[in-house]
Amino acid sequence: MIFTKKVYILLLLGIAIAVFLAILFTQQISIIATLLFDLTVLGLAVWDSRRVKPQRVQVKRYPLHRLSIGRENPVVLSVQSWEKPARIILRDYYPLEFDVSKPTLTATLKPSSTEELTYTIKPNSRGEFQWGDIQIRQLSPWGLAWHDWHVSASQKVAVYPDLVGLRSLSIRLSLENTGTMRQKRRLGTGTEFAELREYGVGDDIRLIDWKATARSTRPLVRVLEPEKEQTLIILLDRGRLMTAQVQGLKRFDWGLNSTLALALAGLNRGDRVGIGVFDREVITWIPPERGQHQLSKLIERLTPIQPVLLEPDYFGAVTRIVNQQTRRALVVVITDIIDVTASAELLSALKRLTPRYLPFCVTLRDPQVDILAHTPTQKIEATYERAVALDLIAQRQVAFAQLKQKGVLVLDAPASQISDQLIERYLQLKARNLL
């Protein structure tokens, strides 16, 4: 039970009455009258608070399943009142590691009504987290006290990679495949026949299917699509550089999100997708397979993995791929680069992949470094920071240039944009038949 401001105002009023009685009567009468008044106020407040108990609202939290890291995940509480209106304050004991939109929720319910209260939480790390109970405060009928109690709602909730982003990507790819966005498909792109469609202005006349046209009343053209059943291998570094925080998440988490997004795109395009995670050794290897069941396997196997403070063995990871994968494949290495010296082993490892495989190096850039490098300043300390940022960018560009000279594809993008840009590059490679 918690007294409201109304009780404290009444108690202060008792003091004012005591002063007034002390003037008119004796001090003893004033003290006795004040004590009786205050005790009456407190007694009424306690009694008023107990009147809430039979009218306690019913509160429950809708079941929480998979939460997505780095996303605003909605949490919904259902509140039901009885015959009388209810004014309540709720506090849900979410994990302290999460960012939350509303620490407390307030509502005023009409008699015999149900209301849903929603807040969002944003996890910044993966794993299993403990949710606590729900604390409820309900205002008494006379407004003298808050009746306070807890509802048991403890549960464990798992935080996964960005499943929300995967769902959005899946919808987008499905729309492209089913024809809703098929107008974006370019004629003649790819090597496999996809469909026939009516000739349109600007279409290449070399793509007209004359036999089909002869059977029809209008000219028809062939639509080609990229070859399917190719192999996509993704190697995800979980070494020391991937433990750094970038835009609220670890580099590894950004890399894991982009890994799963690329895997989804590959599976959607009919390719065989395999993934390896490595530090000093390959700690997880999931052989290439086709089909949507492969995505579920990838999510379950990769979600528990965390980055470690170990230097990665690029050569060892690539060697394992070379020994196990005989077919030509696109090999995507998701990592980070500091300078030419630090990336020497990476360059040596990726050179081993050519020409049998198509190596693709993907790095996650920290936007804060770009901001420091391109923000003029007059302060000495900030000038030093800017110089370091400019040097870091220059060293990375030299390393990227060396990779490109050896036939390695390179993508360096801000961490928050890496998934979209990586998928776009992959679809371009498929369209150009470079695999």
Where are these regions (language model features)?
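Short beta-alpha junction loops
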Residues: 281, 364-368
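Exposed acidic/Ser/Thr-rich ligand/metal-binding surfaces
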Residues: 312-365, 412, 432
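Short acidic-hydrophobic, aromatic-tinged amphipathic segments that line or gate anion-handling sites
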Residues: 409-415
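Extracellular/lumenal glycan-associated context and N-glycosylation machinery
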Residues: 1-60
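Acidic, Ser/Thr-rich peripheral helices and adjacent loops at domain boundaries
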Residues: 296-298, 368-398
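An amphipathic, basic-hydrophobic helix/alpha-beta surface used to engage anionic
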Residues: 39-293, 328-335, 341, 348-352, ...
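Short, charged loop segments at secondary-structure junctions
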Residues: 286-312
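C-terminal "exit" segments of structured domains
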Residues: 418-435
